[in-house]
Amino acid sequence: MKRLKRTADLRALVADWRREGLRVGLVPTMGNLHEGHLALAEYLAPHCDRLVTSIFVNPLQFGPNEDYESYPRTFGEDCAGLEARGVDAVFAPPVEEMYRGGVRQATRVEVGALAERLCGISRPGHFTGVATVVVKLFNLVQPDVAVFGRKDYQQLRVIEQVVSDLNIPVEVRGMPTVREPDGLAMSSRNGYLTQQERHIAPGLYRTLQGMAKRIRAGDDDYRRLEARGRAMLAEQGFQPDYLEVCRADDLTPAAPGDRGLVVAGAAWLGRARLIDNIELELNRDQ
């Protein structure tokens, strides 16, 4: 497995693969990899001939009071896990390689309304940072296919919109959320949880499951369900950020009669901000 830090070296490697007619896949990450990240590589491997994973803690997607400086860097362990999954190259550039004119002066990719709801409210500018770095990676790797986890549903929809709006020739795949045995969605930030908080943490998913069960049973008073769910989270010890039943396509508030839904939630538990979702496809005619 090759380890690359310079964009020129990455471009040269991909150009060699292209000359051989090989199909290239990309798994973008920020490192500190867990089994969910490694599962992304395993998921994508059958869909390409060569697989690149990027490891880059992107300062542009962190707010001023967020955990950019303290975000764990575990490059050696990450590379060992990726190599064991058959990844062909790891691209881990320093910040100055990705933002040569400095982060503040960097050109940005603004997404619009889709990025201004849910996580976009409490993390203003976050999805601008995500969209910008992903477009840069797409330009550098020019992958045929890339994969993102469905746990970060809003991020997946943002990337899908960017690819569509900017006519980027890449197939975007969303991989189902990888969970711990007790249902907690795997996340790098789970490492911030204390032992007691870790015991509480699966309550976010259980709350979403309860809401989804009611919706499948025909309850379409979504605002009441949201209020009840937020109260349940608070009772368990969470500090809810949002808990909403949304249209799956544009993440606007769902209304009775909508069929494609996502029940999405974010909540603080100690130092960890946890997010999760459940996607629903309803058939109200039954």
Curated annotation (Swiss-Prot):
Subcellular location(s) of the protein: Cytoplasm
Gene3D superfamilies with a match to the protein in the record: HUPs (3.40.50.620), Pantoate-beta-alanine ligase, C-terminal domain (3.30.1300.10)
Subunit composition and interactions: Homodimer.
Similarity-based family: Belongs to the pantothenate synthetase family.
HAMAP family given in the database record: PanC
EC number(s) on file: 6.3.2.1
Active-site feature positions: 37 (proton donor)
Gene Ontology CC terms, in alphabetical order: cytosol
Species this protein is from: Alkalilimnicola ehrlichii (strain ATCC BAA-1101 / DSM 17681 / MLHE-1)
Protein name: Pantothenate synthetase
Chief site of localization: cytoplasm
Residue numbers binding (R)-pantoate: 61, 155
Role, per record: Catalyzes the condensation of pantoate with beta-alanine in an ATP-dependent reaction via a pantoyl-adenylate intermediate.
GO BP field: pantothenate biosynthetic process
Positions contributing to beta-alanine binding: 61
Cross-referenced Pfam families: Pantoate_ligase
Pathway(s) the chain acts in: Cofactor biosynthesis; (R)-pantothenate biosynthesis; (R)-pantothenate from (R)-pantoate and beta-alanine: step 1/1
UniProt KW Ligase keyword: yes
Binding-site list for ATP: 30-37, 149-152, 178, 186-189
GO terms for MF: ATP binding; pantoate-beta-alanine ligase activity
